[in-house]
Amino acid sequence: MANIKSNLKRNKQNRARHTVVHSQTSAVKTQIKKTQASKSQKDLSLAYKKIDSALAKGIIKQNKADRLKSRLALNVAR
């Protein structure tokens, strides 16, 4: 455990940031699974929205977002 004030603060910030990032990542994964199960256009657009939101917030990178969208589109088309 940190003894220095700035390290205590940094740990607190890191825990808070981890919670936010983890929940958003989880929301993206959940929406992707729903879309793969239902294979509907409505769910596909919701998944795109979640992926784009995570991309804008820096949760995932551009290449991963493109890859996820591509794979989802292929899955729904089949």
UniProtKB/Swiss-Prot annotation:
Residues 1-34 are annotated as: Disordered. It holds the Pfam family Ribosomal_S20p. Residues 7-20 have a biased composition (Basic residues). InterPro entries: Ribosomal_bS20 (IPR002583), Ribosomal_bS20_sf (IPR036510). GO terms for molecular function: rRNA binding; structural constituent of ribosome. SUPFAM superfamilies: Ribosomal protein S20. Residues 21-34 have a biased composition (Polar residues). One of its GO terms (cellular component) is ribonucleoprotein complex. GO terms for biological process: translation. Disulfide bonds: none annotated. Keywords: Ribonucleoprotein, Ribosomal protein, RNA-binding, rRNA-binding. Binds directly to 16S ribosomal RNA. Belongs to the bacterial ribosomal protein bS20 family. This is Small ribosomal subunit protein bS20. It comes from Malacoplasma penetrans (strain HF-2). The gene is rpsT.
